[in-house]
Amino acid sequence: MTPRQRRLGLLAAALACCGVAAALVLNAFRANLVFFFSPSQVAAQEAPVARSFRLGGLVASGSIRREGDGMTVRFVVTDTARQVPVQYRGLLPDLFREGKGVVARGQLRADGTFVATEVLAKHDENYMPPEAAAALKQAGQANPGMAGAMAAQELRR
């Protein structure tokens, strides 16, 4: 084997290793990437069915229903334009309330019910996740209590 052939062989092996490494990294990102959708986007069928994503908005008033087992909770998440029914089995955060901001992670079933595996509640009256605030602002339903939070988020950018 000539030195030139050896160099080409090493170069080909290095490129193959880089290609495999890049493919593994991209696959890991794709598997762990979780998008955020508002109820309006879910209603417009922009959200994937049977794939994990985050759903954010407000818990609709009068929508919280606990089932007989004490662990399963059904509620509705809204951006005041559209609503998505949510089913969650587990302990809810202490700050989970009707009319408050919530971000749920889970999957959308074919029947339109979002099955959450994790529910996060807004932790104080001035904070709302940027994605949820933007979705509510886009729907034209930003309430006066959120105005300060959204202004603070704009200043941080």
Curated annotation (Swiss-Prot):
The record gives the membrane topology as:
Single-pass type II membrane protein
Q: Where does heme bind?
A: H123, Y127
**In its keyword annotation, does this UniProt entry include Metal-binding?**
yes
Establish whether keyword Transmembrane helix is in the entry: yes
- InterPro entries the UniProt entry points to: CcmE, CcmE-like_sf, NA-bd_OB-fold
**Primary site of residence:** membrane
Q: Which Gene3D superfamilies does the entry link to?
A: Nucleic acid-binding proteins (2.40.50.140)
One GO cellular component term of this record is: plasma membrane
Q: Subcellular localization, per the record? A: Cell inner membrane
- The segments annotated as topological domain Cytoplasmic are 1-7
Q: Which family does it belong to?
A: Belongs to the CcmE/CycJ family.
Q: Which NCBIfam families match?
A: PRK13254.1-1 (NF009727), PRK13254.1-3 (NF009729), PRK13254.1-5 (NF009731)
Q: What is this protein called?
A: Cytochrome c-type biogenesis protein CcmE
